[in-house]
Regions:
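Membrane-helix exit/interface motif
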Residues: 28, 55-69, 87-97
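Membrane-interface segments at the starts/ends of alpha-helical transmembrane spans
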Residues: 1-6, 107, 140-145
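Membrane-proximal helix-loop-helix units in multi-pass membrane proteins
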Residues: 70-142
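Juxtamembrane helix-capping/reentrant segments at transmembrane boundaries
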Residues: 37-50, 101-110
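Membrane-interface helix-loop junction between the first two transmembrane segments
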Residues: 23-44
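Hydrophobic transmembrane alpha-helical segments in integral membrane proteins
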Residues: 1-21
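Hydrophobic/aromatic-rich structural module bridging two neighboring secondary-structure elements via a short loop
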Residues: 40-47, 62-84
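Core segments of transmembrane alpha-helices
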Residues: 49-63, 113-124
Length: 145
């Protein structure tokens, strides 16, 4: 069994690395280099990125800031599912959306894969460290209240 403090530290570092890579990808590649918001074929992709960016705050709060359980934890899992579906849709539309721009560069692909890996490590650790009772719908733990 992993030491919970070490697990939370690794999860936090992974989340921070994900956020830094995501911010770099969004600001540099999407807004500065490719200006996706100005490219009509990439409008939907840009909207997906914006939507996923908005999902980040409640997901981060529910899983990494608050000690959530019960309904709040399940709501967080629902948000993760919605984010995952949006990510899959993004992957499916990205190639065509960027075809006129030359597609996605290898370095941007590396950033996407690496950031996703950090996010998955963070989420997996946080969920693995939760006691089974936290997943009971009748559980109530949330440190922010």
């Amino acid at each position: 069994m992993i030491d919970p403090n070490l697990g939370y530290q690794i999860a936090t570092v992974s989340l921070v690395l994900f956020a830094l890579l995501g911010a770099f990808d969004g600001i540099y590649f999407h807004m500065i280099k490719y200006r996706l918001y100005e490219h009509p074929p990439a409008q939907f992709e840009h909207q997906l990125h914006t939507f996923r960016g908005l999902l980040f705050l409640p997901i981060a709060l529910i899983f990494f800031v608050w000690n959530s359980a019960g309904m709040i934890l399940w709501f967080g899992l629902l948000l993760l599912l919605v984010d995952f579906v949006a990510e899959i849709i993004d992957i499916l539309v990205e190639k065509e959306a960027r075809s006129e721009l030359g597609g996605i560069s290898p370095i941007e692909s590396v950033i996407h894969v690496t950031a996703t890996g950090f996010r998955m490590v963070a989420i997996a650790l946080i969920l693995a460290l939760k006691p089974i009772e936290a997943f009971f719908i009748t559980s109530y733990t949330c440190d922010f209240l």
